[in-house]
């Protein structure tokens, strides 16, 4: 016979037991953490409240992301809180945020083995699969070892391979006849053309289009059309998945999946072409020069492995350099005195116009252009390619700064804790760059103070995961800037908005267009 009292007592007793277990667990965990903190000699980080489980912060962050002001919001948050390291919740996940150089150094270098990528692999896998930017441990080491030869000095030094792409870019500039045009879209096409040639052995030739009467001359294949837009869209979703922390799986709509499919189709063209090559053809490619894809085919014939590695390096080869060039010309167009000083250096070393000495523009000679180097440093300071990143603790550990009344004591980092580090905010900190830290001023890089920055200047990450392609990016950007200065001495801005709205996905670029004129 059904006994209400018996059932009631049964559930009441189990609720009581469950509650007791939960309380006991939290008490035990609290005591354990206190013991570990004492052993490590650290304290808890300061905590900031962000509403119910941080869902308000997630909403606010997504709103700023849509408006192109997310990195500004994150920087201003440090200023509002008044601390360079603090703890908060977003979408229910506890996160520690820091812009302290000592903490970033610990994350990336001195305590490298204490931290890993955590949820990034799962967040990025639908687009990037298993590659250098998504893997940890032996998988990451293997990917890095495969990529390293591609970025050896001999490969990076071949700047002359960029010239045909510069000539295509120049056709688009001349088509504007001295009027305003969007240079950022052209830079993204330029860098994907050079990256595909450099990495895959064949350029996608995206600059050869109908507007300059060269569409029929360009290589065409199934998957090329719509690739750029799909790649951009997929990255937007990856960045939202990253913001959502452990709730990333909720961001998986039809547009995201469709974009991934289009990008994969693009990469599969190059993969199949390499897989269809005979051993003799592969050997000939090797003799002509190191091409990443064809060397990789000698190690594996798994099309998914090949595709994943291609997309990982294409992301770095296209987006970071295009963003760097776009921000550079955005600032140059607004600062004619900087443009004049830059041209003076370029013309003195390499000539100009019809008297340009292309044979003098080499990897070595570009590195000796001191003002050009200062210009790129200043652009990378104000607009770092990867403005924010994160790591996840592999074990109970600590970071050296952020605790105590003076924020100079080590803080406790629990196993599984997410730690974000914001290079964008650190690069604009008055403590390191003075009262004019928000001002674009390349001359600061000739001042003694900038030689003592250490980890306070971090445009290419640091530690064992430091960017393999930094010299490739700097060399390509330097060559493009030098050649455009030689070909088009007159530069003007047609963009009144300052500061610019910035799209911060996996890398950073302008939210919309970069309107300039060159003649």
From Swiss-Prot:
Residues the entry annotates as binding heme: 467
Keywords tagged on the record: Heme, Iron, Membrane, Metal-binding, Monooxygenase, Oxidoreductase
EC number: 1.14.14.-
Inducing or repressing factors: By N-alkanes.
Keyword Membrane annotated: yes
Pfam family, one: p450
Top-rank EC class of the record's enzyme: oxidoreductase
Protein localization: Membrane
Name this polypeptide is given: Cytochrome P450 52A12
Protein family per UniProt: Belongs to the cytochrome P450 family.
Cofactor(s) needed: heme
């Amino acid at each position: 016979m059904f006994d209400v009292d018996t059932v009631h007592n049964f559930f009441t007793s189990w609720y009581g037991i469950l509650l007791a277990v939960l309380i006991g667990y939290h008490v035990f965990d609290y005591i354990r953490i206190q013991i570990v903190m004492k052993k490590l000699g650290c304290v808890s980080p300061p905590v900031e409240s962000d509403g119910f489980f941080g869902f308000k912060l997630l909403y606010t962050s997504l709103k700023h992301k849509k408006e192109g002001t997310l990195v500004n919001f994150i920087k201003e948050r440090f200023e509002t809180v008044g601390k360079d390291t603090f703890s908060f919740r977003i979408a229910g996940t506890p996160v520690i945020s820091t812009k302290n150089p000592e903490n970033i150094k610990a994350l990336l270098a001195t305590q490298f083995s204490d931290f890993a990528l955590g949820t990034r692999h799962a967040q990025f896998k639908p687009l990037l699969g298993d590659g250098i930017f998504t893997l940890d441990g032996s998988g990451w080491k293997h990917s890095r070892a495969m990529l390293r030869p591609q970025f050896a000095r001999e490969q990076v030094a071949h700047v002359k391979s960029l010239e045909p792409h510069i000539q295509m870019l120049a056709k688009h500039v001349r088509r504007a006849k001295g009027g305003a045009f969007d240079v950022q879209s052209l830079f993204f096409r330029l860098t994907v053309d050079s990256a595909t040639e450099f990495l895959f052995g064949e350029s996608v030739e995206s600059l050869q289009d109908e507007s300059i009467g060269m569409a029929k001359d360009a290589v065409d294949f199934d998957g090329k059309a719509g690739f750029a837009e799909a790649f951009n869209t997929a990255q937007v979703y990856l960045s939202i998945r990253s913001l959502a922390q452990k709730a990333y799986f909720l961001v998986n709509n039809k547009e995201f999946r469709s974009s991934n499919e289009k990008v994969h189709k693009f990469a599969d063209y190059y993969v199949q072409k390499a897989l269809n090559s005979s051993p003799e053809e592969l050997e000939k490619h090797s003799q002509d020069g190191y091409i990443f894809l064809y060397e990789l085919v000698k190690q594996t014939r798994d099309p998914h492995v090949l595709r994943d590695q291609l997309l990982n390096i294409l992301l770095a080869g296209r987006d970071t350099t295009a963003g760097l060039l776009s921000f550079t010309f955005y600032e140059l167009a607004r600062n004619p005195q900087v443009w004049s000083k830059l041209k003076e250096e370029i013309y003195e070393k390499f000539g100009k116009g019809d008297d340009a000495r292309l044979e003098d523009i080499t990897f070595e000679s570009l590195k000796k252009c001191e003002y050009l180097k200062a210009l790129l440093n200043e652009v990378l300071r104000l607009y770092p390619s990867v403005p924010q990143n994160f790591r996840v603790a592999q074990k109970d550990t600590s970071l050296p700064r952020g605790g105590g009344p003076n924020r100079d004591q080590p803080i406790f980092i629990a196993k599984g804790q997410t730690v974000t580090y914001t290079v964008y905010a650190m690069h604009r900190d008055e403590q390191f760059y003075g009262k004019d830290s928000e001002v674009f001023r390349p001359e600061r890089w000739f001042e003694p103070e900038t030689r003592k920055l250490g980890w306070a200047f971090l445009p290419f990450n640091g530690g064992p995961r430091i960017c393999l392609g930094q010299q490739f990016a700097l060399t390509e950007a330097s060559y493009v800037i030098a050649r455009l200065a030689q070909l088009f001495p007159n530069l003007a801005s047609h963009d009144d908005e300052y500061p610019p709205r910035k799209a911060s996905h996996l890398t950073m670029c302008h939210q919309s267009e970069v309107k300039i004129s060159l003649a």
